[in-house]
């Protein structure tokens, strides 16, 4: 083989190696950017969902005043007695 053929093969191998390395680095950088933007999309998606829920329920009356858990439990436990008393009358 001549020196020209060897240097041509080396040059081809060098160019191909550089291309593959550049391609690998580009793919890695693109994937990092996608992950970064995807985290922001999740954050903004939650904010948008919260805002839409507030907008949808804006004109509805409040469900109830904030009760403590014990008040809710006591009212639920007293419900059968109240129904039983109402049936006797």
Swiss-Prot record:
Domain of life: Eukaryota
Major localization class: secreted
Keyword match Signal: yes
An annotated GO BP: response to light stimulus
Family: Belongs to the arthropod PDH family.
Protein function: Capable of inducing pigment dispersion in the chromatophores of the fiddler crab Uca pugilator.
Protein name, as recorded: Pigment-dispersing hormone peptides
Native source species: Romalea microptera
């Amino acid at each position: 083989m001549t020196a020209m053929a060897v240097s041509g093969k080396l040059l081809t191998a060098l160019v191909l190696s550089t291309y593959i390395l550049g391609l690998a680095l580009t793919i890695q950088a693109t994937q990092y950017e996608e992950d970064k933007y995807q985290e922001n999309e999740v954050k903004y998606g939650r904010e948008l969902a919260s805002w839409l829920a507030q907008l949808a329920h804006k004109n509805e009356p409040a469900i109830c005043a904030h009760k403590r858990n014990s008040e809710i439990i006591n009212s639920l436990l007293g419900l059968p007695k109240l129904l039983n008393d109402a049936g006797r009358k």
